């Protein structure tokens, strides 16, 4: 039970807007997966409605003389010939109402009672029919009644299978004792009344008459008694009988709930599941509430807690346990609902839980949102937190301090005082809550719960919060109370202190109250909201006068929480009113006599699966079991194994056998004496030990051949029973599968066919492979599978290994050449406050500590230039860059980039430097200054093989305008008008934006007509100034910048600049770029004031180079970027 800070002592569950959801929806009748209906499926409902109508008329007639007089004739006919319908008997009305409800919900015991009644009535009618002296009217009535009874009996017998629902266990003897005692008291009281007001009733008939009215439901014929008392006494006598029945029913319902509530073993199992899987469910701990019942999935790895109210089975939030077993838990719950004839409904499911219920045939509607505080980002600063900040300040000025402790750190006396305060400050008689409240405070089993107290100057506690665990790093609000004398801002102070101290307490998330219709309040208050949204918000504000709809919304939103939606799930909307009432009862807004809310274990029938119960892991006191044992417990081997492929099951069985035999399948490693390549060249006399993965096995009985591969190569090993020292070949085949990693020791030799082999004397398993390798000849043929399981591809595919080695050779060659020229390698920040250094769309992230947006760098240029300003004359960085752009043959969002800067140099110097870097890298990877290109074969132009292309020597150099002019067949230079360039673009069908200048249009023409059509490596120099914001203007050619791009086979490999060192011009250009960024261009660079300030300290004339290493590896190997990267970004399955 909790209260919000709207006013002292307001209940957290004071209205349907409280955290405990009081609106749910259900399915009617049997649910998903229910048994098929026969042609008589309508009989239960028809019987229930018929009996229900009689019960209603009987009750009305018992209290209204007018109604009794109006229906006297049909009532007497029904009573005499069809069904018992006495003139006044409240007790009988109550019995019929219970029977009608039971028939409607298909209870088999109701079918049996109605069938017995019909059989008895038919027998009595048959006896009357056999008697002589009946009038024609009596004969007609008896014949009609007999026919009706026979038809009813036949329908009930034929519809037997439609009444499948059972009744839960209960204290029948105890309820019967209450009924007998109540009837005796009712008879005595009625006898006293009839002695005082006998009317015309004869003295000798008074006791039988009273007994008939109290116990016999007035079913005996009134003509059997001499005289009768006043008609008002008849109603009172029936009321005494009804009260006795009601008390007996209450006792039965109480015993049903108590007997079927959580047992200690049930709670222990739930706590174990929460320990393993509860980190994502903020309401998971409330599943341990002890007046709930529970149903487990058959494998014991998930459970649903629920409560039954007026025939509605309300599931409380998400299933608890392994999300993979949630569907099995839902199936078990629906089967239980069907067994007892309950209508299922779900209250407060999360998005993930609602999806599971939806797949089971339910629909979902959003009820509201749960407020979640993230302690890492919570702060009191900022304009949006002004209200909370002021409230906290007021509370602190009033002398309040906050004390935070675990329940386990609180003494018994202090906890007793805390419980007393919570009860005293509660403004309702009973504790409320069901789906989002624990219903107990200070229980020893809840030692991990957190208690937050507000203490005044006199050390008096004026408010308390109690929060239950949410995984290991979160807490969820359970109790919120404050004294009526507490100062304003008390709750804000407590919540803020808890959030601000979250890191110290190990708390990352705080779940606060639940807010109904939060979206309606927000959307209705927005500027420009439609009339329907405003009307809906107005209605909610109107009802907030009685229920805390807006109050809870306002009390939560001021903390700026994350809103997490919660849902109600249903199958059939026809029973929504009934489920609404059931929800109100479950949450405690409507307190029925049998709604006892237990704090101790009262259940007598554990719901945990038998195998789990017999494992001995669970505790009778409900405490958390040994989680490691629970995790490895073989609860249901068949169900667990049904999801594992056959080959994996076989390998797991082998692993288990090895473990039982004391063999460690994953031992500590010892370096082998030789690699495979070294072993092949080793002397036959020496002992050789190798280790590697088994790729192939050929067993010939006494001799076995296997192929073992390590990083250096592949070797054949030979196992001979005559040579093996410690075991035989049968032991090897029993333990080893393809893919296992083994250690082999022996001598080098030759097989009979002359193959160089290792003759094994001893072997050892050092890594058991639990999944089979792909086809030994084809390997992984699916390109996506090769990307997603690169580790498997490397294990079986030599080509993939060669690509890894080629990439390593390229990186080493580039570094060594730069080192040889006196360059210094540095590392600059990857997380940057401003995205700059290139025009590209960045990846954005956020640092919680500083509450600041950051970007993954798109280039290290601006930081490297800072180093140049500082005097590092030759500097380079070889590292990762990130650009949030497309993914294709030559692009990956994460890539390796080389940037190098040399003082007292220009862009022309880097032409030879870049060419030498690439030629040396190609020689390091391929052995010669060649790169690999696909060879086109056949008329279809299919590229089947790679062929080397010589790239030695000097590469051609062209200006951009010269290359564009050649492609267009018309001269273009810096003086060409924009209109002319647009006409040329239109003629070449190249698109452009209307706001582009001449430089941008020329660049677009270059990209389409020149870059995409270039084959041999070519340097294109002198780009338009407007598209090179960081480049120095050309020293002699106006309108162009000293920049070149290296292009080969349609791919840009690198670029170099004569760097712009004029700080005034640099500021002007970056300012123009920042205006583009403000205007919505996501690729434009932002203004970096720190960099501009550094430039004002003067940078020496510098030439800079940028080169994509991934594309360089692509060029040298002839492969796509996804093939050359060990782990390229892949879309999720």
Curated annotation (Swiss-Prot):
Its cofactor is Mg(2+). Gene3D superfamilies: Bira Bifunctional Protein, Domain 2 (3.30.930.10), Nucleic acid-binding proteins (2.40.50.140). One of its GO terms (cellular component) is cytosol. Residues 627-1133 are annotated as: Lysine--tRNA ligase. Its main location: membrane. Binds 3 Mg(2+) ions per subunit. It catalyses: tRNA(Lys) + L-lysine + ATP = L-lysyl-tRNA(Lys) + AMP + diphosphate; L-lysyl-tRNA(Lys) + a 1,2-diacyl-sn-glycero-3-phospho-(1'-sn-glycerol) = a 1,2-diacyl-sn-glycero-3-phospho-1'-(3'-O-L-lysyl)-sn-glycerol + tRNA(Lys). The keyword tRNA-binding does not apply. The chain crosses the membrane at residues 43-63, 82-102, 109-129, 140-160, 177-197, 233-253, 575-595. It is found in: Cell membrane. HAMAP family: Lys_tRNA_synth_class2. In the N-terminal section; belongs to the LPG synthetase family. PANTHER family: LYSINE--TRNA LIGASE, CHLOROPLASTIC_MITOCHONDRIAL (PTHR42918:SF15), LYSYL-TRNA SYNTHETASE (PTHR42918). This is Lysylphosphatidylglycerol biosynthesis bifunctional protein LysX. It comes from Mycobacterium leprae (strain TN).
